[in-house]
Structure formats: C-alpha cells, structure tokens
A protein has these predicted regions:
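Alpha-helical transmembrane segments
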Residues: 2-24, 50-98
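Cytosolic, membrane-interface loops and tails of multi-pass inner-membrane proteins
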Residues: 20-52
C-alpha cells in the first residue's frame, strides 16, 4: 500500500501546473499566449527571467520532492518510481483545467 500511495502522491505533485500559477499571478494566461504551451519555457518568454524563475524552480522541486518522498517511504527504488510518477503527472496533469 505504501508504494501505491507514494506513486499517487508523486503523480499529484507532478500535476501541479506551477508555470500556470506563476503566470496567473502576473496576469498572464500561458495557454492563450505564444504557442499555448503552459510550460516554464513559455513562462520565460512571456514573463521574462525575473518573473519566470519560480516556474523553473517549482518544476525542479516537484521532481525533487517526489524523489525524496519515495526514498523516505521505501528506499532508492521507490524514489526512482516516484520521480517517474511525478514526470507522468507533469506530462499528463490531472489539474490541467486550472
């Protein structure tokens, strides 16, 4: 059960659309600008480096947090699996409609 719960939490962590939240804080909807990609690179192009760095940091912290959660819950192997689950959440986010 610990493995499944860790993977679910890691997936949900990866699903948080950090770039969209950062851009929304600055009054920009990334899905309606440039190529429509709600990612950190589009945030950089639309907001500039000073305002977009939290998007890059948030994406990095999602993966790091998932890995540390997995290691704490079940060792290195589960850490790798948790990072994979976070990557799946990042690529196929549950919270895409935010």
């Amino acid at each position: 059960m610990t493995y499944a719960a860790t993977c679910i939490v890691a997936y949900l962590l990866g699903s948080i659309p950090v770039s969209l939240l950062v851009a929304r804080r600055h009054g920009v909807d990334l899905r309606r600008t440039a190529d429509g990609n709600p990612g950190a690179w589009n945030a950089l192009e639309q907001l500039g480096p000073r305002r977009a760095w939290p998007a890059f940091a948030g994406d990095a912290l999602k993966g790091t947090g998932a890995g540390l959660l997995g290691i704490a819950a079940g060792g290195v192997w589960l850490g790798y699996v948790a990072v994979g689950a976070a990557m799946l959440g990042h690529a196929f986010p549950l919270f895409a409609g935010l």
